C-alpha cells in the first residue's frame, strides 16, 4: 500500500492509503488483522482529477460499504495532505454520490446526503 496512514474521524478509526488496484475481501481482512490498532475500516483514495477523489471504503470484515460520513472526512483530509487535489475544496466520490468537502487545517466540513426514509431502500 502506498502512503498508508492511520486516521481517526470523530470516533471511527481507519487505515487510509492511495488506491493502487482492487483488493479481494481476504486481502482487506488481512490488512485489518495486521493493524497494530483496532480499526473500523480501510479506505483507498483514488485521484479522479485535480478536484475529485474516489473513496473505496471497506468495513473491517472486508465488505464494501456505500458510505461512512467519518470516512468521507478522512478521505478529504488524506487527499489534501497527499496533494491528490489542487486545493482544500474538493469532491469525494462515494457509491451514494458526490459529496462536497472543505478542509481547513485540522477541520473537515462536508455536505452529507439526506437519510433515506423509504422502506424500499432499506
Spans of features found by a protein language model:
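A glycine-rich beta-to-alpha transition motif near the start of alpha/beta enzyme domains, typified by
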Residues: 1-105
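Conserved small/polar residues in nucleotide/adenosyl-binding loops
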Residues: 120-122
Amino acid at each position: 500500500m502506498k502512503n498508508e496512514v492511520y486516521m481517526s474521524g470523530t470516533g471511527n478509526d481507519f487505515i487510509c492509503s492511495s488506491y493502487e488496484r482492487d483488493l479481494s475481501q481476504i486481502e482487506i481482512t488481512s490488512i485489518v488483522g495486521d493493524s497494530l490498532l483496532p480499526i473500523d475500516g480501510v479506505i483507498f483514495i483514488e485521484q479522479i482529477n485535480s478536484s475529485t477523489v474516489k473513496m473505496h471504503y471497506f468495513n473491517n470484515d472486508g465488505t464494501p460499504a456505500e458510505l461512512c460520513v467519518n470516512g468521507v472526512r478522512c478521505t478529504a483530509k488524506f487527499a489534501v495532505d497527499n496533494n491528490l487535489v489542487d486545493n482544500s475544496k474538493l469532491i469525494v466520490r462515494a457509491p451514494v454520490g458526490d459529496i462536497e468537502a472543505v478542509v481547513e487545517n485540522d477541520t473537515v466540513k462536508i455536505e452529507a446526503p439526506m437519510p433515506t426514509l423509504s422502506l424500499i431502500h432499506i
